[in-house]
C-alpha cells in the first residue's frame, strides 16, 4: 500500500476541517474540539478504570452510569475487549535529541510487539525527524516489525525539497528542519488508522518536542479523534542534552493534551530503560482490562453538535475515557457490530 499526504494542507492553508458547526453548535471546547464519530443509533466508548491498586477488571454494566449533556443514558452493552482485533501504530522519534535513547526505544518497542501481537492483530511503524517515513506497513509479524525498528536511525539532515509524507508523497513545509511530531501523528491517524476497524492505539516514543511541523497540536488531536484512536505518548528524553545546549525541555504539555483528548495517558520515563519497559507493560495491562461501553443516545439527531459525556463507575475509581464527541452522521462509532 502506497500512501502520500495529498490530503494534508499546503503551507498557505490549514488541513481540511470537519464541517464547521454553526455558532450555536459550538461545544465547550470550541469549533476545533475533537470529534468522535457516531452512527445514529449507537455511541461507543472505550475506557479503563483504576483504583489505588491499579487497573480494575471486574466491572459490570450495572456498576456504571453515563450521561450525555447531563442527561442520563441507558447503557446497552458493556464488555471487556480482550479479544477484539487490535491495530497498533508505533511512532518513533529519530531526531537528533533522541541519539542517546534510540537503542532503548528499539529494544523495548520490539519486545512489546512480540508480547502483544496475535495473528488477528496488526501494527505499523513510522519514524519522524525532518521527514515522516513509513518503516513498516501493516503486518502481524513481530519479526518484520523488529527488523524495521532496528533499521531506524537518527536523522539530523536538512531537506531542501520539503518534507515527504508517508510513502514519499509531498508534505510541504516552510521549515524543513526539526522534529515533525504533529505532522507524524496527523499522517498516522488520517492516512493509516482512520480506515481501520476494531481497537486502535497509537504509541509515540518521543521527547515531546515539535519543531517544524506544518500542522498544530490541535490538528493532530482532531485527526486522532476522527480515527477513533487512543494515544499513549511515552516521554523518553535525555534532558541533560537540553541543559548542555542551553535549551528548555518543554515536551510534556502538548502530549498531555493529545493523550487526554483521545482517552490515553502520558507516561514519562526519562532516559531510564527499566522505566520504559514498565511503561510498555502498563499499556499491555490496560489493553487487557479495557472496556467498551455502548449506549443509544436519547438525542438521536446527528446534527454535528457537541455532546459532553460523563462516565462514572463509582467506588472511587479513576475513569480514563474521552470526554465527549460531535454527533457526525455516518461516522465510525466504535466498530462493535
Predicted regions and their residues:
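Bacterial N-terminal signal peptides
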Residues: 1-2
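Scaffold/interface architecture of coatomer-like assemblies
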Residues: 5-337
Amino acid at each position: 500500500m502506497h500512501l502520500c499526504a495529498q490530503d494534508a494542507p499546503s503551507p498557505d492553508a490549514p488541513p481540511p476541517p470537519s464541517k464547521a458547526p454553526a455558532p450555536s453548535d459550538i461545544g465547550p471546547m470550541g469549533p476545533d474540539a475533537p470529534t468522535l464519530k457516531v452512527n445514529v443509533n449507537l455511541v461507543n466508548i472505550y475506557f479503563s478504570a483504576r483504583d489505588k491498586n491499579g487497573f480494575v477488571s471486574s466491572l459490570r454494566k450495572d456498576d456504571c452510569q453515563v450521561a450525555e449533556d447531563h442527561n442520563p443514558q441507558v447503557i446497552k452493552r458493556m464488555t471487556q475487549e480482550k479479544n477484539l482485533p487490535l491495530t497498533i501504530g508505533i511512532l518513533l522519534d529519530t531526531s537528533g535529541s533522541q541519539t542517546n535513547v534510540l537503542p532503548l526505544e528499539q529494544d523495548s518497542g520490539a519486545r512489546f510487539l512480540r508480547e502483544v501481537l496475535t495473528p488477528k492483530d496488526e501494527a505499523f511503524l513510522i519514524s519522524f525527524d525532518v521527514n515522516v517515513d513509513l518503516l513498516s506497513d501493516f503486518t502481524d509479524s513481530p519479526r518484520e516489525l523488529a527488523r524495521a525498528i532496528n533499521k531506524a536511525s537518527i536523522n539530523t539532515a536538512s531537506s531542501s525539497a520539503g518534507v515527504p509524507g508517508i510513502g514519499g508523497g509531498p508534505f510541504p513545509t516552510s521549515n524543513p528542519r526539526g522534529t515533525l511530531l504533529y505532522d507524524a501523528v496527523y499522517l498516522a491517524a488520517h492516512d493509516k488508522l482512520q480506515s481501520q476497524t476494531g481497537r486502535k492505539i497509537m504509541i509515540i516514543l518521543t521527547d515531546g518536542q515539535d519543531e517544524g511541523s506544518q500542522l498544530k497540536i490541535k490538528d493532530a488531536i482532531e485527526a486522532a479523534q476522527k480515527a477513533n484512536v487512543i494515544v499513549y505518548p511515552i516521554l523518553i528524553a535525555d534532558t541533560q542534552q537540553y541543559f548542555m545546549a542551553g535549551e528548555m525541555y518543554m515536551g510534556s504539555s502538548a502530549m498531555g493534551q493529545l493523550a487526554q483528548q483521545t482517552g490515553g495517558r502520558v507516561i514519562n520515563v526519562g532516559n531510564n530503560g527499566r522505566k520504559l519497559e514498565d511503561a510498555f507493560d502498563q499499556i499491555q495491562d490496560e489493553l487487557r482490562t479495557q472496556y467498551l461501553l455502548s449506549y443509544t443516545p436519547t438525542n438521536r439527531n446527528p446534527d454535528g453538535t457537541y455532546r459532553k459525556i460523563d462516565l462514572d463507575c463509582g467506588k472511587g475509581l479513576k475513569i480514563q475515557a474521552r470526554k465527549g464527541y460531535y454527533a457526525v452522521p455516518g461516522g465510525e462509532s466504535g466498530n462493535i457490530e
